[in-house]
Amino acid sequence: MTVTVRFAPSPTGYIHIGNTRTALSNWLYASKNNGKFILRYDDTDVERSKDEYAQAIAVDLDWLGVRPDRVEYQSKRFDIYAKAVEKLKTAGLLYACYETADELERRRKFRLARRLPPVYGREALKLTDAEKAALEAEGRKPHWRFLLPNFESDPFATQRTEVHWDDLVRGPQTVDLASMSDPILVREDGTYLYTLPSVVDDIDMGVTHIIRGDDHVTNTGVQISIFKALGATPPVFGHHNLLTTISGEGLSKRTGALSVGSLREAGYEPMAVASLAILIGTSESVTAAPDMAALAEHFDLASISKSSAKFDPSELDALNRSLLHEMPFEKAKPRLEALGICGAKAESFWLAVRGNLDRFSDVSHWWQVVSGDLPEAPDLSGEDRDFVRHAFDLLPPEPWNGQTWKSWTEAVKSATGRKGKNLFMPLRLALTGQAHGPELADLLVLVGLERTKSRRP
């Protein structure tokens, strides 16, 4: 058996960090088991689904390193769903209902007032053909419900009917079908709700494992019943915890909250996003994995907490810095070249500045410092200006090396009596225009004698 998983986003908005958790969980599970990953667009809602969102999802996944083995669109598979509908109708497992939303709401309130569970009472099963014809003559069109197998022979005498599965994340799970309403699978206009196309596609595409958010736990009992009604063996299920904002609010792709695209545009490294999306809310320590192979080593569905996890952007900042600070030159080289940073000193430059980067784009500033003019003249007081002028008069001749800074500052200390911060800070400001930054012993060599002299105040 080839492990086959799927990520099935609706292209009705941009995917966010919570969706990323699901996509990466499936991708990593398939990767660890030599399996296949299907990207399946749940675009049956023709009105709200947009091609621009589908394209954006593909771009976001590719940026994260997720490359599907197969891409499918549910909007191209309506004929397959229609055949499944007919199969269920023929088996007497899909029945027509004519209630309006208002009528259903009144019935729900009626049951609640009598302390009864607010489940659908299957009143439509009592309709005669003549009554159905009369309702349709009024202009009503039926929606179609799946008859849950929660009875022996009389559908109005429901009984406790447990559906069990061994969840990859949550362990043994049980839901009672008697506590649920028969789900609507087909709307009045003939369009499909999520459930039926999802099950039909999972069967048709050979999906063996479904890994998704724990907001789908209750749905699983219904879906297992539909799998069996269609003559298929249900796949293995795993329900991971959900991510929330730091304040505990749910994430929504329609509001753009923490969208993958916005994180990319903000300059975060894809592996920083992937590492936090996967490791937060688990028993694993949240560390930055340099690549997907390393992240896969820390990925374990059994380590996921059953409680929701809060996504803290400050943790993302820390992971991003960690990745940049440890990034080898060979990995950074193509990106540096794309920014025009190349030549004999590119490697020593990268090794000098990487420990001070929050975003990769910060390298452009430091390249300007070592290769061009300072963006702004350093703000030095009169006393510090005189000190720096004196210090620059003591600059040693080239060639310079890693010891030049030490020998120069020792000479300056002897000549001026300054030491510590009073010595180093004015020199840093004069050389870089910044109060903080990479080690000056490394930068001085990169700046070189002539450029250093040109910065004499």
From Swiss-Prot:
This is Glutamate--tRNA ligase 1. GO terms for molecular function: ATP binding; glutamate-tRNA ligase activity; tRNA binding; zinc ion binding. GO terms for cellular component: cytoplasm. The lineage of its organism: Bacteria, Pseudomonadati, Pseudomonadota, Alphaproteobacteria, Hyphomicrobiales. Catalyzes the attachment of glutamate to tRNA(Glu) in a two-step reaction: glutamate is first activated by ATP to form Glu-AMP and then transferred to the acceptor end of tRNA(Glu). The keyword Electron transport does not apply. Keywords: Aminoacyl-tRNA synthetase, ATP-binding, Cytoplasm, Ligase, Nucleotide-binding, Protein biosynthesis. One of its GO terms (biological process) is glutamyl-tRNA aminoacylation. It is found in: Cytoplasm. CDD domains: GluRS_core. It catalyses: tRNA(Glu) + L-glutamate + ATP = L-glutamyl-tRNA(Glu) + AMP + diphosphate. InterPro entries: aa-tRNA-synth_I_cd-bd, aa-tRNA-synth_I_codon-bd_sub2, aa-tRNA-synth_I_CS, aa_tRNA-synth_I_cd-bd_sf, Glu-tRNA-ligase_bac/mito, Glu/Gln-tRNA-synth, Glu/Gln-tRNA-synth_Ib_cat-dom, GluQ/Sye. Its EC number is 6.1.1.17. PROSITE patterns: AA_TRNA_LIGASE_I (PS00178). Belongs to the class-I aminoacyl-tRNA synthetase family. Glutamate--tRNA ligase type 1 subfamily. ATP binds at K253. Pfam families: Anticodon_2, tRNA-synt_1c. A motif ('KMSKS' region) lies at residues 250-254. It comes from the Bacteria. Monomer. A motif ('HIGH' region) lies at residues 9-19.
